[in-house]
Every structure is written in structure tokens, then in C-alpha cells.
Curated annotation (Swiss-Prot):
This is D-galactarolactone cycloisomerase. GO terms for molecular function: hydro-lyase activity; isomerase activity; magnesium ion binding. Its cofactor is Mg(2+). The lineage of its organism: Bacteria, Pseudomonadati, Pseudomonadota, Alphaproteobacteria, Hyphomicrobiales. It comes from Agrobacterium fabrum (strain C58 / ATCC 33970). The gene is gci. It comes from the Bacteria. Gene3D superfamilies: Enolase-like C-terminal domain, Enolase-like, N-terminal domain.
Length: 378
């Protein structure tokens, strides 16, 4: 069994209403899928976190090391590709591109052996997961406080048990949003906040102290990811558990953050941290440090499927009669090709997502959607 082709599919949809996080503005949704084909006709799919066109370029740069290789040798291939660009970058695009490749290889491996990736990872602990809704970005020409409150009330009505809102736009305004959302969703729905590294240490500590009374499950990315000491200071300086990890990439970045005592909750993104081969190592590191894992998810149905396979195989920590079950991030911002790329969408029904049990990722790609949402040439 040999790899014969590596392809990327650039997807894009321009938004009618742009929106912002604390760190960047979105006027479109853009993602890249990775397709790897083998000499026996088996095809695997993956996805990369981050800017689509640069990721595609790095995937193609890696392809020379992939053609002719046995796709089942995922650990060997991962090490070779990582080493190929090691001197130029141990994080960033070299890892996000490698993630999409690794996911596709595991999809192939699962199809070859007739088993879901979760089974190849060691077995399924669960057949479904509860999801929390992500949204509440700052939209143009609307009142942010009322817009966020009404949006999260809708998510409650859809059956979600938890939601995450965007902050980082200023302490006083953010507190008004948090208060309005809590009032709109009631006292029982879990609420998380995500600053997208938009605060200084002082601002984050002030916000955390004043927001804690609203019953916040975690405070995500309070400061920029390079400042691990700042993370630790925020964690020590206010009462809300601190979360982060989508931008640290790979076991080495996660190890440094965990060693610094930066977070209570680690959020690796399968499409950015190195894929299935790497997230298993990251999960072990988190367990050794007594830190809970809640994967970050921001992409198409391919990423949703990958996250579900990993979460099916996540061992409870600790194993007990009533274990702490993982929860899945479920992006509810506008993205018409998120589910369209799949022949059978992976939707949250009453806030619960069923985990596919077919071979590999357990999904089939809708190639018509790849054509419909193809990114225009530059």
C-alpha cells in the first residue's frame, strides 16, 4: 500500500455580516481540506487549522516526502515530516499542515483495517458527546450586549447545556455582555468566556475577579500564547479556571505550558496540534499534570469528525463510577460549507452529537460542495 497523490481543497465563503474576535476580523470563512490517495484507491481526508492558502502550500511542500510511502506507518511519517521543517518552525504552519496530513493518514489506516479511528486509538468509551455552543462574536452594526444575549438564549432553546462567548473588547463592556448573557440563559446553563488573547495580565485578572460571580466554567486564552508566565499569573490572580492550548501546537509547546502551570484546562486542536499521532502524546502529558483536556474545534465537518473520534477514545481521568465526561466545542457561527462537505452532516441534536462508528473518520465527503465552495484563485 503506497501513497500516490496528495491534494488540497481550498474552500471559502464571504460573509454578508463580518464579525470579530478580540484578535482578528473575519469577512469570510476559509478552510483547507487535505486529500491523500493510495495505489489501491483508498482515500483519506484531513483538515488544517488556520490560514487556508498558506497551509495548502506547506502541505504541498511536504508531499515529496509522502509519495511512495506506506500510509499505515503514521508514527514514522509524522517524525520524518516534523524533522523536515524542524529547523524552521516547531509550531505554526509546519504543525498545522502536518496535522491535516496526519488526520488523512489515520483515515486511510482505519479504512484499510475496517475500523474507526477511535478503535485504533484503543477503544470507544462513549458513543456520543454533549456539545457546547461557540458564538457571540462581535458583529458589525449591531448592539453587542443584546446580540450576544439573544444568540445564547437561542442556543439554550436548541438544547445546548453550555455556551462560550467572546470577550477581550474591554473589561467594562465585556462585563455587561457576560451579565446580559447570564440573565438570558438562566442560572443552570454552563457559561465559558474566551478572550482570544486580547487582554493584558492586569485586565485579565480584573475581569476574572469581577466575572466570577456569574458562574463561569473557564476563562479561555486570557493573554497572548507566548507569555506562559503571564498565563500562570492570571491563573493565580483570579478565581476562574484558565483554559488555553489551541495555539501552542505539538507536544513540546504543550509540555512547556503545562510545566509553567499555565492552565487548568488544555485545549489542543486536532487540526493544529499534530493530528491523531500527536494528540495522544499531549493527552498523556495532560494526565501527568492533572490537567483536563477539552479539544478546540473550529472548522468543517472533517474536523468535527476527527474531534469526535478522539473524544470517543478519551480515557476518563480518573476512571470512576461517575466519570467526568468530555464536552465538545460546536461552532454555531455562519459557515454554509461546514456540514455541506459531508454527505451525512454531524449535527448536535438537543446539544448531543453522535460519534460515527464507520471505518476511519466514519464520514463520506460531498465532492459537489468542494466545487461549490472552491476558493477563487488569487
Amino acid at each position: 500500500m503506497k501513497i500516490t497523490a496528495v491534494r488540497t481543497h481550498l474552500l471559502e465563503h464571504r460573509l454578508d455580516t463580518p464579525f470579530e474576535s478580540a484578535s482578528m476580523r473575519f469577512d469570510r470563512r476559509a478552510h483547507v481540506l487535505v486529500e491523500i490517495e493510495c495505489d489501491d484507491g483508498t482515500v483519506g481526508w484531513g483538515e488544517c487549522l488556520g490560514p487556508a492558502r498558506p497551509n495548502a502550500a506547506v502541505v504541498q511542500a511536504y508531499s515529496g516526502w509522502l509519495i511512495g510511502q506506506d500510509p499505515r506507518q503514521t508514527e514514522k511519517i509524522w517524525a520524518v515530516l516534523y524533522n523536515a521543517l524542524r529547523d524552521q518552525g516547531q509550531r505554526g504552519l509546519s504543525l498545522t499542515a502536518l496535522s491535516g496530513i496526519d488526520i488523512a493518514l489515520w483515515d486511510i489506516k482505519g479504512k484499510h483495517y475496517g475500523a474507526s479511528i477511535s478503535m485504533l486509538l484503543g477503544g470507544r468509551w462513549r458513543e456520543s458527546v454533549r456539545a457546547y455552543a461557540t458564538g457571540s462574536f462581535k458583529r458589525d452594526n449591531v448592539d453587542r450586549v443584546s446580540d450576544n444575549a439573544s444568540e445564547m438564549a437561542e442556543r439554550r432553546a436548541e438544547g445546548f447545556h453550555a455556551c462560550k462567548i467572546k470577550i477581550g473588547f474591554g473589561v467594562e463592556e465585556d462585563l455587561r455582555v457576560i451579565a446580559a448573557v447570564r440573565e438570558a440563559i438562566g442560572p443552570d446553563m454552563r457559561l465559558m468566556i474566551d478572550a482570544n488573547h486580547g487582554y493584558t495580565v492586569t485586565e485579565a485578572i480584573t475581569l476574572g475577579d469581577r466575572a466570577a460571580g456569574f458562574g463561569i466554567d473557564w476563562f479561555e486564552e486570557p493573554v497572548v500564547p507566548e507569555q506562559l508566565d503571564a498565563y500562570a499569573r492570571v491563573r493565580a490572580g483570579q478565581p476562574i479556571p484558565v483554559a488555553g492550548g489551541e495555539t501552542w501546537h505539538g507536544r513540546y509547546g504543550m509540555w512547556q505550558a503545562l510545566s509553567a502551570g499555565a492552565v487548568d484546562i488544555l485545549q489542543p486542536d486536532l487540526c493544529g496540534c499534530g493530528g491523531f499521532s500527536e494528540i495522544q502524546k499531549i493527552a498523556t502529558l495532560a494526565t501527568l499534570h492533572g490537567v483536563r483536556i477539552v479539544p478546540h474545534v473550529w472548522g468543517t465537518g472533517v474536523q468535527i469528525a476527527a474531534a469526535l473520534q478522539f473524544m470517543a477514545a478519551m480515557t476518563p481521568d480518573p476512571v470512576r463510577v461517575n466519570p467526568i465526561e468530555p464536552i465538545m466545542e460546536f461552532d454555531r457561527t455562519h459557515n454554509p460549507f461546514r456540514q455541506a462537505v459531508l454527505r451525512e452532516p454531524l449535527e448536535a441534536v438537543n446539544g448531543v452529537v453522535t460519534i460515527p462508528d464507520g471505518p476511519g473518520l466514519g464520514i463520506e465527503i460531498n465532492r459537489d460542495a468542494l466545487t461549490e465552495f472552491r476558493m477563487p484563485d488569487p
